[in-house]
């Protein structure tokens, strides 16, 4: 068994690239570790093949030759034991052949030849890498095809002088004729109108040929969800003569099913059991429109009207949830989407729906209404969405939150904040997504920004006026062949005007628009909404002001009151584990964050809470199923403690801190689907 495989002397080519060029590889970590290798079934064992091993030396030499190191030599050291083989490749790279001149001719006035040559992958002073030479030629071809020259020819030349370790490189370019699009040919449509295809593509008759527009057109066709296959290219022609200045663009499509039924189910730490269903009709009333009807239900089995007592067994995270919020969550909606609204780059959607949603330990929201959204896809493929929503909504939160922030402590007086009211908001969303996957990204980055504003000018009730902003940036890097390092920064704030209430002029922010923290997708050392301002109510029992403790039989209700400022930072290393055929992925992470309230506290370094943890992910067709365990070494957050007496909340303690639990209580378990970010 190959126990170890290493390299020495390699500087120009890293270990990972060398390993990928070879047939010989070392056994997995579990198969090599002394403590577990004896189990036999853990890890993948790799054995030495003498023939492939000798060929690996030639493969490494060939890689160095192509990379410009013509004098490279490779030696090996093989140490054998009764069970294992230890291999070491000793590489002497030698002096590389370097490019001393790069001449680019034939482009004329199309592009500045000297400037282009200085920006190609292979440049003067670099080792003479044949792979980069080919990549440079491909770059020149792509540039010409995007500027109206679809049939360029490039004659590559180079003169290598091994004794001097120098190479002169030249590209002689024949661009061919500059071409315009004569006509568009569409084939493959059956029930979908040809006009839908023509609206989606980015190339039109009379345009100067641009290959990038052909690729963009294919992407636009797939985004419609109307086609299983789409191809946009130059039509085949046996009669094309040299010097022709026009081409026909051929669009080939194959229609997909125009009906789609979705059914799903799952389990989450906070949602308990959840189900969803949806029916989508594509090309509804023609013109590529989409009609979508969907319904989602969660917290099945833990609240009215499906109270099966699951909070006492399979969903223990909900065991302490207030009965007011322990209800079935639902969202039922009907949406009509117009793919081309005013322009081919703009789409629109009208949605009507009803919702009941409970945010754990925070609030219950019921709403019915509609929204109108317009999305503009910029020339840089960055969608910007503006939306207006109007509905009738009711939000119920713990009366103690109104007592704490608004000094409204009579319980009947807090009813004014929970009455149904009109809610009208304007939203703006920005997404710059360059990650390679939505569910499980391994490289790239993603920037999102969200802005939402509510005011009486838009039709909102006088109590529902605020401005809220949130920005998030995440980045993903491969640090090994299958390991990924990911990090994220998220921050936001919400402000509201002063309103004249009975308690005085106060800034009221609705509970559903406040900032919360803690949980599987933010700071995992805390439970859902545990990070940030809290408020506690003594429902039963007594409080001793001398000791600052409640009696053993006391029942204290904890609610998250939220804040108006938030910042999160996360770092996570994801790496494959050598079990279950590589479908199990491990993770180590560190989360940091703070939720603050102006006037009470500010976002500071000392206030930021840092929690480490470990996790596991199992790859499935629907995305990774995730189990995370976060460790919280901090004492419980202190808060005000109230007690209801004769219809009023009486303050018992300004800074009440519950008793700390044992070591086990410092860990938080989170189970969900998809990566944390």
Task: Label every PLM stretch briefly.
Residues 42, 123-124, 296-298, 317-319, ...:
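Short hinge/gating elements
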Residues 122, 203, 223, 281, ...:
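Conserved helix-loop functional segments at active or binding sites
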């Amino acid at each position: 068994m190959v126990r170890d495989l290493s390299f020495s002397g390699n500087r120009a080519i890293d270990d990972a690239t060398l390993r990928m060029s070879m047939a010989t590889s070392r056994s997995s970590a579990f198969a090599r570790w002394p403590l577990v290798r004896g189990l036999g079934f853990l890890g993948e064992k790799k054995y030495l093949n003498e023939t492939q091993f000798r060929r690996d030396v030639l493969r490494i030499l060939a890689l160095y030759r192509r990379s410009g190191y013509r004098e490279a030599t490779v030696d090996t050291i093989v140490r054998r034991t009764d069970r294992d083989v230890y291999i070491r490749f000793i590489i002497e790279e030698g002096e590389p052949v370097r490019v001393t001149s790069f001449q680019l001719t034939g482009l004329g006035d199309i592009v500045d030849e000297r400037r282009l040559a200085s920006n190609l992958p292979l440049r003067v002073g670099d080792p003479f890498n044949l792979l980069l030479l080919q990549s440079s030629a491909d770059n020149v071809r792509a540039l010409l095809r995007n500027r109206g020259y679809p049939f360029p020819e490039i004659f590559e030349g180079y003169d290598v002088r091994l004794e001097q370790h120098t190479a002169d490189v030249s590209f002689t370019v024949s661009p061919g004729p500059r071409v315009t699009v004569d006509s568009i040919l569409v084939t493959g449509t059956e029930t979908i109108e040809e006009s839908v295809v023509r609206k989606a593509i980015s190339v039109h008759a009379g345009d100067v040929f641009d290959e990038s527009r052909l690729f963009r057109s294919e992407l636009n066709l797939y985004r419609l969800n109307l086609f299983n296959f789409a191809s946009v290219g130059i039509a085949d022609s046996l009669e094309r003569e040299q010097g022709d200045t026009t081409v026909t663009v051929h669009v080939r499509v194959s229609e997909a099913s125009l009906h789609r039924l979705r059914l799903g189910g799952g389990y989450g730490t906070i949602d308990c059991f959840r189900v969803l269903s949806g029916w989508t009709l594509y090309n509804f009333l023609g013109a590529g429109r989409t009609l979508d009807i969907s319904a989602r239900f969660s917290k099945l089995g833990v609240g009215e009207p499906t109270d099966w007592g699951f909070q006492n067994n399979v969903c223990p995270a909900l065991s302490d949830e207030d009965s007011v919020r322990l209800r079935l969550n639902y969202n039922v909606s009907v949406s009509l989407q117009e793919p081309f609204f005013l322009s081919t780059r703009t789409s629109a959607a009208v949605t009507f729906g009803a919702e009941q949603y409970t945010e754990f330990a925070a609030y219950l929201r019921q709403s019915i209404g509609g929204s109108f959204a317009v999305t503009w896809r910029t020339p840089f493929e960055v969608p910007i969405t503006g939306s207006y929503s109007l509905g009738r909504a009711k939000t119920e939160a713990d009366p103690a939150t109104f007592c704490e922030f608004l000094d409204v402590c009579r319980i009947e007086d807090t009813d004014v904040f929970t009455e149904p009211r009109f809610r009208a908001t304007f939203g703006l969303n920005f997404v710059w997504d360059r990650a390679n996957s939505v569910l499980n990204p391994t490289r790239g980055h993603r920037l999102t920004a969200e802005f939402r504003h509510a005011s009486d000018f838009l039709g909102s009730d006088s109590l529902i006026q605020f401005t809220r902003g949130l920005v998030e940036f995440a980045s993903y890097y491969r640090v090994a062949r299958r390991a990924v390092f990911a990090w994220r920064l998220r921050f936001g704030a919400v402000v509201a005007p002063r309103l004249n209430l009975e308690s005085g002029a106060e800034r009221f922010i609705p509970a559903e628009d406040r900032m919360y923290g803690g949980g599987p997708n933010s700071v995992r050392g805390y439970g859902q909404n545990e990070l940030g301002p809290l408020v506690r109510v003594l429902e039963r029992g007594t409080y001793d002001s001398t000791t600052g403790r409640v009696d053993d039989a006391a029942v204290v209700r904890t609610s998250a009151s939220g804040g108006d400022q938030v910042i999160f930072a996360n770092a996570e290393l994801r790496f494959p584990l050598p079990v279950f055929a590589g479908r199990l992925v491990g993770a180590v992470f560190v989360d940091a964050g703070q939720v603050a309230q102006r006037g009470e506290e500010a976002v500071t370094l000392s206030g930021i809470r840092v929690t480490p943890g470990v996790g596991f992910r199992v790859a499935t067709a629907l995305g990774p199923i995730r189990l995370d365990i976060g460790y919280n070494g901090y004492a419980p957050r202190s808060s005000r403690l109230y007690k209801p007496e004769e219809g009023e909340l009486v303050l018992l303690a300004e800074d009440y801190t519950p008793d700390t639990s044992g070591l086990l209580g410092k860990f938080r378990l989170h189970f969900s689907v998809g990566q944390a970010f």
